[in-house]
Curated annotation (Swiss-Prot):
This is WD repeat-containing protein 48 homolog. Catalytic component of the Usp12-46 deubiquitylase complex consisting of Usp12-46, Wdr20 and Uaf1; regulatory subunit that, together wtih Wdr20, stabilizes Usp12-46. The Usp12-46 deubiquitylase complex associates with arr/arrow; the interaction leads to deubiquitination and stabilization of arr/arrow. Belongs to the WD repeat WDR48 family. One of its GO terms (molecular function) is ubiquitin binding. PANTHER family: WD REPEAT-CONTAINING PROTEIN 48 (PTHR19862:SF14).
Amino acid sequence: MLTHKNNQGGRKKMQVSFVIRDAEEKRHRNGVNALQLDTINGRLYSAGRDAIIRVWNSMQNNSQEPYIQSMEHHNDWVNDIVLCCGGRNLISASCDTTVKVWNAHKGFCMSTLRTHRDYVQALAYAKDREQVASAGLDKAIFLWDINTLTALTASNNTVTTSSITGSKDSIYSLAMNPSGTVIVCGSTENTLRIWDPRTCNKIAKLKGHAENVKALVVSEDGQHVISGSSDGKIKQWSIGQQRCVQTISVHSEGVWALLMTDNFSHVISGSRDKKIIMTDLRNPTNSVLICEERAPVLSLCYNYDQTGVWATTWNSDIRCWKLNPSEKLSFEVACIKGGAAIKKYHVLNDKRFMLTKDSEMNVAIYDVLKVKKVEDLGKVDYEEEIKKRSQKVYVPNWFTVDLKTGMPTIVLGQDEVDCFAAWVSAEAGLPEHAESGTDPKVNYGSLLLQALLEYWKPPPPHHHLQGVGSDLDSNGCDGDIRGNEYFSVPKHTPIIFSEVGGRNVCRLLVKDAVGETESALLSETVPSWVTNVVIERTIPKFIKLPFYLLAHPSMLKQDRSKKERLIANEFIQCRKVCEHVLEKVLGADLPASTGNSNSSQNNSQSDANSEGSQVPAEERIELLCNDVICDPNMDLRTVRHFIWKQSSDLTFHYRTKSN
C-alpha cells in the first residue's frame, strides 16, 4: 500500500510556462482523446489534447450552441476520463503525470494526485465498487477509492492507494468489469496482463498481439476481454481458458478504440485507417462499415439512446454517426465543431514577435512579451510573411515554444535557453513605451516574469512581520513594487510551474495569484531565479562580449596597428565603439576636419577641435568588420551574428572618414 500526499518533496530544476490564448476557449484546438456521456442529463464530456476537458449538451441540434463549460487544470494532453458517482464526479488522466478529481456539474478541480512518474495514459472504472484505476508509461497501476478521493481537502490530503505490479512495459490501455473482480492492462509488451484488483494477485498473461495493445473492454461477468492493437487486429479472449478465442481482421491499420453493445454481442471499432466498423462477434464475417472519418479515430462513445455513436479523431471536431447495421454506410447525425490547431511557428529576429500557421492554413502574429495575438493575417503565404518581417538584428533566444496542445505555450527557464539572455534598448524593444531623450536597457525575461506574477504578494517571513508604527502604504502593502513599469499581461493567462523534464507542480491564472491559498502555494513553488527578479528586483547580469580593435591599414600612422582587446555589454551599439575610438584611441591627434591634411594651418586649432567635437563620432569614425562597414545603430551581438560569423573574438577595424 502506498500513502500519497498532494505535495512535492525535494526541489528540482524548475521552469515557468504560460499559454497565449483567449479568455474562453469554447472549441477544442487539437485532437480529442476520450469521451464520456452522462445519460441522465445528456452531457457529453470530451478530453482534449489542448489540455482542456469540455462539456457539451449532446441533445442540441446543429443549429444550437452545444458548449456548456470548460474544465481546466491540466497543462498537457488529457488522455482519458471516467464519469463516476452517478455523474457527479469525473476523474481525468493526463500527460502532465497527474490524475485529477473533478466536480463534474460545477466543473472545478477538487484534488490532484501526483503518484505517477510519467504520462498517465488510461483509466478504468468499476461502477459497482466506485473504484477507479490509473496506469501509464511508468508501468504502474494504482487503484483508488472514489469516495475517499472526493472527500480530500487542503488539510485532509492524504489518500491510500493499492499498487498493482508486474507490468514490464509502458501501459496504454486499461479495463475493469463493473463489479471490480478483474482488471486488464495492455502495453508495448504486446500482451494482456490480468489481475484480481481485490487482492492484486495476477490471474493471467495473454500473448497473441504483434504490437502495442491500445484498447480494451472487459465483459460484465469478467469472463471475456476484447482487445484492439496497433497490429490492426481485434481479439476476443477467454479469461477462464486463458486463450484467444478469435481474431478479427477488419481494419488495415491499428485499432485504437473499442465499444461493446450491452449484451457483448457486437464490437464497434475505430482505427488509424479512419474507419468505424461494427462486427458481430458470433459471426465475424458480418461486419458493417458505419463511416469513414476524416482522420484516425481516437475514441468512441454511444449517444444518449444508443442509436448513434460519438467519435473523436486527431482533428478537433466531434461527430455523431447513426448506427444502422442494415445500411451499407451510416450518416452524420451531429457535429460539435472544433477550432484550428497551430502547427507551425517562426520567432522573428527581434525575439519578441512570432508568426504562426494553423491547421486551417491561417497565419497570425503573436506578441510573446505581452502574451497576446496581435493580428490575424488570414490565408496568406507564410514564408513570404516571414521574409517581409525579417530584420537585420540579433537578439539571443530567451524562450522556447511548444505547440503540443495546439495553442502556443511559451517556456521560460534557466536550462539550455536562459530567459534572462535578451537585453535590449527600450527604444528598440519597446518603442511604444520609450520616452524621448532616454533609452534605458530592458530585459525581456525579467519584464515578462514581473508581469506574469503582478498579482502575487508573498506572505512576509515571520521575522519580518510589521508591528506598530511600521511603514505601510495606503493599500496596506509594505512598499512592494508590483509588475513592471511598461505593461501588464492578460489576467486569464495560465501560468504553469513544472520540473524541467515535465512534472507539473502548480498551475494558476495570472489573476488568481492574489488569492491567499494561491499565494501560499506560489511561495512554496516559485524558484529563486524567479523571485530574485519579481520580488527582490535583482537586475539580471549583462552579457559581456570581448572584441579586438585595430587601426585599418588605410590609416596613416602605422604605430596604431597594435591590437586592443576590449570587453563591453553585447547590446552596445557600434556608435559607442566609434566614440571610444575618437576619445580614447585617437584623442587629440585627430584633427577637426579629418579629410584636410593641412588642417594645422587653421587660424585656431582649439576652435576647430571645439567645432569638431560637436560632430557625432559615427560621422568621423568608420568601423569595419570583415571589410564590411558597420551601421552605427547595429549592436555588437548583431555584428557578430551577421557579419563576423565566427566563434573567435569579434574583430573591428577603424578608420577616419573623408569629407
